[in-house]
Each structure stands twice: as C-alpha cells, then as structure tokens.
Regions:
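ABC transporter nucleotide-binding domains
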Residues: 2-7, 12-208, 214
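Non-catalytic surface loops within mature trypsin-like serine protease
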Residues: 29, 127, 236, 264-266, ...
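Residues at or immediately flanking beta-strands
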Residues: 60, 132, 229, 284-287
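Surface-exposed charge patches
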Residues: 100, 118, 241, 276, ...
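A short linear hydrophobic-aromatic micro-motif
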Residues: 124, 248-253, 284-289
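ABC transporter nucleotide-binding domain
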Residues: 173-265
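C-terminal coupling/interaction segments
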Residues: 266-310
Length: 310
C-alpha cells in the first residue's frame, strides 16, 4: 500500500506558544483518517501546514513524495481542500464555478468539461449544473465545495468540518459521499464531531494541546469501546472476596451497599460467572448490565488524561 502523506516531527510556534508539538503520522492510499481534537488543540494549524498555507517551525511534510516546502507546486497539485467555510461564488451557476476552479487547478482546456462532469457525478450534482449556487441548500453547497476539491483528481482530499450546519439528512448524505471518496482517494476529515469519525473513517487520530495523543484504527477503537466493566445490583450484600477469585476481575467498585461495578479484562465476559455466584449464594440479582464505553467517553478520558499529566 503506497503512502500518500508523510508528516515527520512537525512543530509550529507562535511566539512562546507551541500550537503543534512534534507531530508525526502517515496516510496510506484508500484510508479515511479522522483528525479529532477540541477547539484550540492544533487541528487547523496542522491542516494549514499540510496544505502549504503555513510554514512549520520545524518538521517535514511530503505529499505523494513531494516536499511541501521544497516542491510546493507539485505537492499542492496532489491535494484537494475544502475549508470549513466553502469558497463559493453564490452568483455563479454550479457549472460556471466548477469550470473556473478547473482553470485555477491548471486543468487543460480540452479536459475541463470532462473534469467538471466527473466532479458533478461523484458529488451527486449531475442535474445541478445550471442552478445558481446561491439558490442551493447548505447540503448541496457543501457538495459543490467537495466537487471543486476533486476536479483535478488529487491523491489526497482534506475536508475541514464538512457537516457543520447541515440537517440530519444532509449529514447522512455527506457521510456517504466521504466514504465513497475514500474508495478512490485518501481523505483527511478534520472535525470535532465524534460520530462523524465512527461513521466515515477507517482510522482516527486525536490531537490535544498540540500533541498526538491517539492514533488508532476504527477496529482498535471499537475494541476500546467494548465492555470492560459490569454493573450489578444484589438483593443481599455479597461476599466481595468471591469476585476477586474470578481470574479476569481487575477491581471492584462499591457504588452502594447492594450495587457494584466489577472491572475486568477486555475481551472477556464475566456476567455468567457473576450470575452463577449470586444464585449459588442466594444474593438475588436486581440488575446485571455490561457497561459499554462510547466514543465520547474515550475522547474525554484521553484528552482529560493528557491534560492532567501536563
């Protein structure tokens, strides 16, 4: 699998403030990378450096083998970019705007029409060519913004908060479009909306205070989200020492006299063992519920944990 983006030891200082601190990662062909972080974490600064709009204080960025500093034109030709606010001209039709963008991308005059048709087709705009951009819904305006980013068939597409301000149906449509783009391009999705990453990406990175604090596949993240604790309530107070004898149990947390949270190793289910203990000892079970971590809990634990160590 070919690597399309290589970022090595990237840092950016603004005076005494370090906005991005020693960030390294890569993006392979066909990957959709979710780039997550709270406001002020360094997401936008990192994206600006990758796009060549901001020079790093130190570090190296290569786009499909081209150094963004040493070979900026060749590197930028491999990129398609949709900023958070799409750079649209509302008084132009979709065809007029995309034709103009094709010229800016340096597409040959004889290939412009074909490129515009391909961009419209990929983004669900085939019947929208004569419509004024000002008269399009926010969802279709986002599609036009994505279309301009892929006209020149770039290796990498960078999307900055592409679903902000959209209604639920439009969000679902843009998510599906992002997944489809991932089949032919590599995509970086910069967002602070956690479900976007779960639904659209194959890998996730979290940046916090300028540092990468997580780089994980969605499969790996899903494993983190599987249950590693059991919430249980008994009719009678149990003998806790019996739970400690269960090999996979790591800790027992008392919530009240009859309710407990039993922590265990990931990948194991202890519910049946706990239920059998309760029956054999006549404790009676009022509640037995595996607790699953959602992505928001994981995000908060990672970012808050990294804050506590600083």
């Amino acid at each position: 699998m070919s690597t399309l983006i290589e970022v090595h030891h990237l840092s950016r200082q603004f005076g005494d403030h370090c906005a991005v601190d020693d960030v390294s990662f890569s993006l392979d062909k066909g990957e959709v990378l979710g780039f997550l972080g709270p406001n002020g974490a360094g997401k936008s600064t990192t994206m600006r450096m990758i796009c060549g709009n901001l020079t790093p204080t130190i570090g190296e960025i290569k786009i499909n083998g081209y150094d963004i500093i040493e070979q900026p034109k060749l590197a930028k030709a491999e990129l398609g970019f949709l900023p958070e606010i799409p750079p649209l001209y509302p008084d132009l039709t979709v065809d007029e705007f995309l034709t103009y963008c094709a010229k800016l991308h340096g597409i040959r005059k004889t290939a412009i029409k074909k490129s515009v048709l391909r961009g419209k087709s990929k983004c669900g705009l085939a019947d929208m060519g004569t419509r004024l951009i000002a008269n399009l819904s926010k969802g279709y305006q986002q599609r036009v913004g994505i279309a301009q980013a892929i006209l020149h068939n770039p290796s990498v597409i960078i999307l900055d908060e592409p679903t902000v301000g959209l209604d639920p149906i439009q969000i679902l449509e843009i998510r599906e479009l992002i997944r489809e783009l991932g089949n032919e391009h590599s995509v970086i999705l910069s967002t602070h909306i956690l479900p976007e990453v779960q639904h659209s990406c194959s890998r996730v990175q979290i940046i916090h205070h300028g540092k990468l604090v997580l780089n994980e596949s969605i499969e790996g993240l899903s494993r983190r989200m599987t249950s590693s604790s059991l919430k249980v309530r008994f009719c009678e107070q149990p003998e806790l020492a019996l739970f400690q004898d269960i090999a996979q149990v790591t800790a027992i947390e008392e919530l009240d006299k009859q309710q407990y949270r039993i922590h265990h190793e990931q990948g194991f289910s202890i519910a049946q063992t706990v239920a059998k203990l309760a029956v054999n000892n006549d404790w009676g079970i009022l509640e037995l519920m595996p607790e699953k971590h959602d992505m928001e809990q994981i995000f908060l634990s990672i970012t808050q944990g990294s804050s506590n160590h600083e």
